[in-house]
Swiss-Prot record:
This is Queuine tRNA-ribosyltransferase. Its cofactor is Zn(2+). It catalyses: 7-aminomethyl-7-carbaguanine + guanosine(34) in tRNA = 7-aminomethyl-7-carbaguanosine(34) in tRNA + guanine. The active site is at 95 (proton acceptor), 269 (nucleophile). Catalyzes the base-exchange of a guanine (G) residue with the queuine precursor 7-aminomethyl-7-deazaguanine (PreQ1) at position 34 (anticodon wobble position) in tRNAs with GU(N) anticodons (tRNA-Asp, -Asn, -His and -Tyr). Catalysis occurs through a double-displacement mechanism. The nucleophile active site attacks the C1' of nucleotide 34 to detach the guanine base from the RNA, forming a covalent enzyme-RNA intermediate. The proton acceptor active site deprotonates the incoming PreQ1, allowing a nucleophilic attack on the C1' of the ribose to form the product. GO terms for molecular function: metal ion binding; tRNA-guanosine(34) queuine transglycosylase activity. Substrate binds at residues 95-99, 149, 192, 219. GO terms for biological process: queuosine biosynthetic process; tRNA wobble guanine modification; tRNA-guanine transglycosylation. It comes from Staphylococcus carnosus (strain TM300). Its EC number is 2.4.2.29.
Length: 380
């Protein structure tokens, strides 16, 4: 049986080794490297599906944990699945719920069967297992589902992480057995291992034997220094299949998107562009702009003079500052629209640079303009 999702390799950048490819799914194809906006509760905050199409978002994320708790996977199944429910006709990836459960560290208990935990709002007792995660994701009907994994904290003791990745492998096998719709939903495995290179290798090799149609690197971008993350990605990549999509979870800052594309990753997601937009922080071609700052009060220029998105074509920095200061929802819509447009355009530029075998040159140009070449660059 042909997997529901396949990877087509187009070319490798001669200068950097980055990959240009196409991921084919039941709801359409997208070129990689690609950034995926996060729609936690079946909506990318403040953005309509039409606006997502306008900015060239090809695939979006849904969050299994949140959708299970509200409105419930049974309702979404009755609605015809997540695509119908939220009126999105492109590909959707759902996470397994694992990351959310593991972030409730003081409210949870990990066992071999799964994780017992308390609802983050009302305190009710809940249980999530590989089988339950598959049932929920099968009901949601996403194109790409993620295996239920344990996401160990970083740093963590070696023995703890080793036990954790071995449990993640056993859970991955249970996910494959429980997955009811492999013909129209692809299940990806998640490589863990914290900051231990031998454990990253062990996790990758064990999961590759299970022959998932795609693989993710999890447990990074959780607060470790970026050089550590880049080192782990570079090390882990060599144990990942060349003929399947590679997804780096939780990465969305411009520098990391470029650096990890260079290191052979294809897919990225992060709440960063939408989360910082709600505080009025914007990514621009000249670096970070905190639009609430007083210096923009009388600035009638566009947010980013080098951007041709709807926000930058139509509204001034002064107007955006006014809206954010006044806590007007429209301001958040405009900053969110711009940030997502900016990152999706960055990915387009990365793909073009790979086509032209000049991604390292592009990195230098971008870092210089964005202000990332200084000793302590501003981060988000």
């Amino acid at each position: 049986m042909k997997p529901a999702v396949t990877y087509e390799h187009i070319k490798t950048c001669k200068q950097s080794g980055a990959r240009l490819g196409i991921v084919h799914t039941p709801h359409g194809s997208f070129e990689t490297p690609m950034f995926m906006p996060v729609g936690t509760k079946a909506t990318v905050k403040t953005m309509s599906p039409e606006e997502l199409h306008d900015i060239n978002a090809k695939i979006i994320l849904g969050n299994t944990y949140h959708l299970w708790l509200q409105p419930g996977n049974e309702l979404i199944k009755r609605a015809g699945g997540l695509h119908q429910f939220m009126n999105w006709d492109g590909p959707i990836l759902t996470d397994s719920g694992g990351f959310q459960v593991f972030s409730l560290s003081n409210l949870r208990k990990i066992t071999e069967e799964g994780v017992y935990f308390r609802h983050h709002k009302n305190g009710s007792k809940l249980f999530l297992s590989p089988e339950k995660s598959m049932e929920i994701q099968n009901d949601l009907g996403s194109d790409i589902m993620m295996a239920f994994d344990e996401c160990p904290p970083m740093p963590a003791e070696y023995k703890y992480v080793k036990d954790s990745i071995e449990r993640t492998t056993r859970w991955a096998e249970r996910c494959l057995k429980a997955h009811a719709r492999p013909e129209d939903q692809a299940l990806f495995g998640i490589i863990q291992g914290g900051e231990y290179k031998d454990l990253r290798q062990q996790s990758a090799e064990e999961l590759v034997k299970l022959d998932f149609p795609g693989y993710a690197i999890g447990g990074l971008s959780v607060g470790e220094p970026k050089p550590v993350m880049y080192d782990m990605v570079e090390h882990t990549e060599q144990f990942m299949p060349k003929d399947k999509p590679r997804y780096l979870m939780g990465v969305g800052s411009p520098d990391a998107l470029i650096e990890c594309s260079i290191r052979g990753m294809d897919m990225f997601d992060c709440v960063l562009p939408t989360r910082i937009a709600r505080n009025g922080t914007c990514m621009t071609s000249e670096g970070r702009v905190v639009i609430k700052n007083a210096k923009y009060a009388d600035d009638l220029g566009p947010l980013d003079p080098n951007c041709d998105c709807y926000t930058c074509r139509n509204y001034s920095r002064a107007y955006l500052r006014h809206l954010i200061k006044a806590e007007e929802t429209f301001g958040i819509r405009l900053t969110t629209y711009h940030n997502l447009y900016f990152l999706l355009k960055l990915m387009e530029d990365i793909r073009q640079a790979i086509r032209e075998d000049r991604l390292l040159d592009f990195k230098e140009e971008f870092f210089e303009q964005y202000g990332l070449n200084v000793e302590n660059p501003k981060n988000f």
